[in-house]
Design a protein with these regions (language model features):
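Nucleotide/phosphate-binding catalytic cleft detector across ATP-hydrolyzing
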Residues: 1-14, 115-117, 135-142
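Short glycine-rich, Thr/Ser-proximal phosphate-binding strand/loop in the N-terminal lobe
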Residues: 8-58, 91-94, 161, 165
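Short glycine-aspartate micro-motif
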Residues: 14-18, 74-78, 142-146, 152
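Short glycine-rich anion-binding loops that position phosphate/pyrophosphate groups of nucleotides
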Residues: 22, 82-85, 148-150
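Short, acidic, Ser/Thr-enriched surface-loop or helix-capping motifs
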Residues: 30, 87, 156-157
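Glycine-rich phosphate-binding loop and adjoining helix at the ATP-binding site
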Residues: 49-57, 73-77, 83-141
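Conserved active-site "lid/cap" helical segment
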Residues: 55-71
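Glycine-rich phosphate-binding loop of actin/hexokinase-like ATP-binding domains
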Residues: 137-165
Length: 165
């Protein structure tokens, strides 16, 4: 069954991607940010960066298939990435838990799917998500600590994300 957009004028879908030390998860949302598809796999970072980039693209395609959505219907993808990032180059500088360095993650996804990609630190993305859509809605300040394969913290104050090192 195909998911229809929820407004007449906006037929775009959006993808959120969480790249973690042990798992990767893609979720497809309709224009009202209702979940309509998802896919998840183990990250297997030690298989190497090139294998990891291919695995990311596979998970995205599986999520699109689950949602019965084609890439040309997607308005964009946001990916939360571990480790220090180069936001200007849209790359992971280093992801120690994965063993990857200088990863052109946004370019790889855009080359494959032809929709825009934004990257963010995974914890920053999680905290901002809670501020915008979760427990922190209507709060002036949201601070989060995210333990996982590693640990990180983030803060949103009056709608502004404060980025760390």
């Amino acid at each position: 069954m195909s998911h229809q957009p929820t407004t007449e004028n906006d037929n775009r879908y959006w993808i959120g991607f969480d790249l973690g030390g042990t798992k990767m998860l893609a979720t497809v949302f309709n224009s009202q940010f209702k979940k309509v598809g998802r896919a998840r796999k183990k990250t297997k970072g030690r298989d190497g960066m090139k294998a990891g980039l291919l695995r990311i693209n596979t998970v995205i395609q599986e999520a699109l298939n689950d949602a019965d959505v084609s890439a040309d219907q997607v308005g964009g993808l946001g990916i939360g990435c571990p480790g220090p990032l180069d936001l200007a180059k849209r790359q992971i500088r280093t992801a120690p838990n994965l063993g990857w360095d200088d990863v052109p993650v946004a370019d790889s996804i855009e080359k494959e799917f032809k929709f825009p990609v934004a990257i963010a630190n995974d914890v920053d993305a999680g905290v901002f998500g809670e501020y915008k859509f979760g427990a922190g809605q209507n709060a002036r300040c949201v601070f989060g600590i995210f333990p996982g394969t590693g640990i990180g913290g983030g803060c949103v104050y009056e709608g502004r994300l404060f980025r760390g090192a």
